Amino acid sequence: MKMTKLTTLLLTATLGLASGAALAAESNAQSSNGQANSAANAGQVAPDARQNVAPNDVNNNDINTNGNTNSTMQHPDGSTMNHDGMTKDEEHKNTMCKDGRCPDINKKVETGNGVNNDVNTKTDGTTQ
């Protein structure tokens, strides 16, 4: 049987589309973001999924249980965060370090009063 190039191309395209349609018909995805939905069903973070579920072994009744309807994040003792007594430079350094951009993480500083050989230690307490 002799086939022309056009016939071969049409046959290949038809088989490809038919097999793709058969695979799509077998899946039980209800939307076009099936991978995200599967990830959410498995407990993974999937922002584009139709439904995000709590991680395994987490009771939804234990989330946000302090009874405060205020949208401000609170410390475990219920107090808000304040920077009383901090200079602008200390606040800036604190913010930078929280973002993972601590400007002087390896700088040796005096972490105490200098009596207990603490002058030559790093900010994390090590001496190397």
Curated annotation (Swiss-Prot):
Keywords of this entry: Signal
InterPro entries with a match to the protein in the record: Uncharacterised_YbgS
Record field: compositional bias (Polar residues): 71-82, 113-128
Disulfide bonds: none
Domain of life: Bacteria
Biased composition (Basic and acidic residues): 85-110
Stretch forming the signal peptide: 1-24
Region of interest: Disordered: 24-128
Biased composition (Low complexity): 24-44, 52-70
Name this protein carries in UniProt: Uncharacterized protein YbgS
The gene coding this protein: ybgS
